[in-house]
């Protein structure tokens, strides 16, 4: 890669040296497996692969946390294949977060050429006619959490022989199993343990993860079992140049910079035009399509033929075609969502461009790791977007380069998540008091609530499912809400779904809804029937709802003092959202086209929150709502903007409210709450790391070059109050007061 190509991109903030591999001889394996590894060029193993193998063979559950492209999959394949070649009845399940990754790994397993290994994918695309044969013949089944939930577990009797001989359960890419999705998967894995034991099975679990702060804790939280950690990476890596780039300022007063999408397209096109094989990662499907389109226009007809977008939503055939063309070198570049962040093999690449913060520092490293596999050199580029978290990382490269990665959290105490899985478990086999060992300390209370709701019924000392349907089919693994709204166009064709709790703000009559680059206007929303109807409209305006939020403190669980008599609290709250108006805004110039009233039912949410209380406003102080309320509001926005750096979540997963006098405590109060029923631990991370969160927020706001606040510091794209009022200087004064850096009350 030429020096000129790198220098054209911006400042190189780091040159990471290569790392030599630590190689060890193969252990005593079945001759066919040893021969297959030799033929594949793996005549020796990386040290971490051998350690994982030996620990699994010793009967331990193992989590492997090493870098991208370090051969983590061999850590579970070798023990699984060794078992199967030595005992014909031995069975394994390999669990992948996506069907695409399972298909990719199926090809790799077949590439071993082992006649005693009979792998098969088992997912929603598997024909019914093949499923019985898979249960009977396959000794390695590749599937995903969704299919485990609705396909295997409810039909465990048919899988009885397989489960009786189940010896290895591998969970690949475990770092993506966090928050709501991870908590659901934790319940699914515990249900798997339960039915396996019912049939006499006792599998070992092997989890692989990108580098995160708490791999062992995550593995134990997901499965409810003790784990050994393997994280001493023995794989080699080539030299890597790291470039951080900020789009140029267009308007200093407003803090407005060139679009992240435009900047990403410029960098991507420049690299591809130089023959550098590149992946650009975008944060959404729409962003990936737009970056590709802008880059194609810049490259011209011939250059555009060598690039492609890649995202979920394409057919399996389309994705395989793109992957194959990239692997073969026919394509020089791909613009992808995080669909390619996971381990689908696309061959040797030279450069990765992260277009904005992808949701975690761990994901940045995962994306960068897609280039320069083995000892090859690579280029890693991070382009900052306009929001506060992107700008914070641009200003603080050590937060990324120092690998200060986040902790991934799951919970088994959220009744909105655990409850549906207890119903599914009771349908699989009656529950009893012993099942607390699978489902944790919340089991008894949640089961009692399910009985009160007549979803479970007593049968002697056991609990049975009280209805005739299949409860597993009512579980959405990616939502903490029971209900979804179906969105159809005027011809009746389904174009999307949304959680019922978000429908009033996102699917109200008149709202714009985007689907595959097309704009729709919601004509009707029926919350009783959980249905919305949308019609195609020109893509030249968008809508913003006005949301009035109230927060009621239900239970204060933890509290601690802050400087100057302020206090920090954490506990359970009940939020009530009222969508009262919406406005139309023209895309071209952000001109407001009109404000329209709405009459919709309130949405309530019981969840977890942190809240900060200030002492009463000093006597004699007469702060205006714009100044003091704006300080509280801006401080709230600033902390919410950076909380994903601590909690490994998305900004949209968090809600907030600030008020100069809360109706329960009569004190100035800022709330930051989990945006999911029951909570998933996001606000707890903010409570636990509050001082660091507040300090980093001060740094973001003070370094931002805008005069009165912008999306890079205190404005929020999700604000239900349309970012009014906000005070940039007031937010800094407030946060410094809470940190004890000043004793001056922020209203004075």
Question: Where do the protein language model's features map onto the residues?
Answer:
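Short, histidine-centered active-site or binding-site loop motifs used for metal coordination
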Residues: 170, 248-249, 616, 676, ...
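Short cysteine clusters
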Residues: 704, 709-713
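Helicase motor core with emphasis on the C-terminal RecA-like subdomain
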Residues: 1-40, 44-47, 51, 56-431, ...
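ASCE P-loop NTPase motor cores of helicases and related translocases
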Residues: 43, 85-87, 116, 267, ...
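Extended Lys/Arg-rich polyanion-binding regions
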Residues: 378-380, 386-404, 419-433, 448-449, ...
């Amino acid at each position: 890669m030429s020096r000129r190509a790198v220098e054209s991109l911006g400042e190189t903030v780091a040159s990471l040296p290569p790392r030599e591999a630590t190689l060890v001889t193969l252990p005593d394996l079945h001759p066919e497996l040893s021969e297959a590894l030799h033929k594949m060029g793996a005549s020796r193993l990386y040290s971490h692969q051998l350690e994982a193998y030996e620990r699994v063979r010793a009967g331990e559950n193992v989590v492997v946390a090493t870098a991208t492209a370090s051969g983590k999959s061999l850590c579970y394949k070798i023990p699984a294949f060794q078992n199967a070649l030595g005992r014909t009845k031995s069975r394994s399940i390999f669990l992948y977060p996506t069907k695409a990754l399972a298909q990719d790994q199926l090809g790799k397993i077949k590439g071993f050429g082992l006649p005693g290994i009979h792998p098969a994918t088992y997912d929603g695309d598997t024909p019914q006619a093949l499923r019985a044969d898979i249960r009977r013949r396959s000794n390695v089944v590749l599937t995903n959490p969704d299919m485990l939930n609705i396909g295997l577990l409810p039909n465990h009797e048919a899988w009885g022989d397989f489960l009786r001989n189940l010896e290895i359960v591998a969970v690949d890419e475990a770092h993506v199993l966090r928050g709501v999705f991870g908590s659901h998967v934790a319940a699914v894995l515990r249900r798997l343990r339960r039915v396996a034991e019912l049939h006499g099975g006792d599998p070992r679990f092997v989890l692989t993860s990108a580098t995160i702060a708490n791999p062992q804790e995550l593995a134990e939280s997901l499965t409810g079992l003790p784990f050994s950690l393997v994280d001493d990476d023995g794989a080699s890596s080539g030299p890597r140049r790291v470039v951080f780039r900020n789009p140029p300022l267009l308007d200093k007063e407003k803090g407005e910079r060139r679009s992240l999408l435009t900047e990403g397209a410029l960098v991507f096109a420049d690299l591809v035009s130089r023959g550098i094989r590149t992946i650009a990662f975008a944060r959404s499907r729409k962003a990936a399509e737009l970056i590709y389109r802008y880059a194609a226009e810049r490259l011209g007809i011939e250059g555009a033929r060598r690039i492609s977008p890649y995202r979920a939503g394409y057919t399996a055939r389309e994705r395989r075609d793109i992957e194959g063309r990239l692997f073969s070198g026919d394509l020089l570049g791909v613009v992808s969502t995080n669909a390619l962040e996971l381990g689908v093999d696309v061959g040797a690449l030279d450069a990765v461009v992260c277009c904005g913060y992808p949701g975690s520092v761990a994901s940045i490293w995962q994306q960068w790791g897609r280039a320069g596999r083995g000892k090859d050199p690579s280029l890693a580029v991070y382009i900052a977007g306009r929001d506060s978290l992107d700008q914070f990382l641009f200003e603080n490269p050590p937060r990324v380069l120092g690998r200060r990665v986040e902790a991934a959290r799951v919970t088994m105490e959220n009744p909105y998540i655990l409850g549906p899985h207890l119903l599914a478990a009771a349908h699989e086999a009656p529950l009893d008091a012993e099942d607390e060992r699978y489902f944790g300390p919340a089991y008894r209370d949640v089961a009692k609530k399910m009985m009160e709701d007549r979803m479970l019924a007593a049968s002697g000392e056991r609990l049975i499912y009280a209805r005739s349907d299949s409860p597993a089919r009512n579980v959405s693994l990616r939502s903490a809400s029971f209900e979804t709204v179906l969105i159809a166009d005027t011809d009746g064709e389904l174009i999307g779904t949304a959680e019922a709790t978000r429908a009033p703000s996102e699917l109200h009559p008149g709202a714009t809804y985007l689907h595959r680059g097309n704009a729709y206007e919601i004509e009707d929303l029926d919350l009783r029937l959980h249905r919305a109807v949308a019609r195609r409209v020109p893509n030249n305006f968008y809508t913003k709802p006005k949301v009035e939020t109230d927060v009621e403190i239900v239970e204060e669980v933890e509290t601690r003092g802050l400087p100057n008599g302020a206090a920090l609290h954490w506990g359970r709250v009940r939020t009530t959202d009222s969508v009262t108006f919406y406005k139309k805004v023209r895309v071209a110039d952000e001109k407001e086209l009109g404000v329209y009233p709405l009459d919709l039912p309130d949405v309530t949410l019981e969840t977890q929150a942190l809240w900060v209380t200030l002492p009463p406003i000093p006597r004699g102080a007469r702060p205006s709502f714009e100044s003091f309320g704006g300080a509280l509001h801006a401080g709230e926005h600033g902390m919410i903007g950076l909380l994903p750096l601590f909690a490994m979540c998305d900004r949209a997963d968090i809600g907030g409210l600030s008020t100069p006098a809360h109706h329960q405590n009569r004190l100035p109060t800022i709330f930051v709450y989990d945006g999911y029923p029951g909570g998933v631990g996001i606000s707890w991370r903010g409570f636990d790391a509050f001082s660091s969160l507040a300090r980093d927020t001060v740094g973001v706001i003070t370094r931002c070059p805008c005069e009165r606040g912008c999306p890079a510091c205190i404005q929020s794209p999700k604000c239900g109050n349309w970012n009014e009022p906000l005070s940039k200087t007031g937010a800094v004064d407030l946060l410094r007061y809470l940190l004890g850096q000043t004793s001056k009350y922020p209203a004075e």
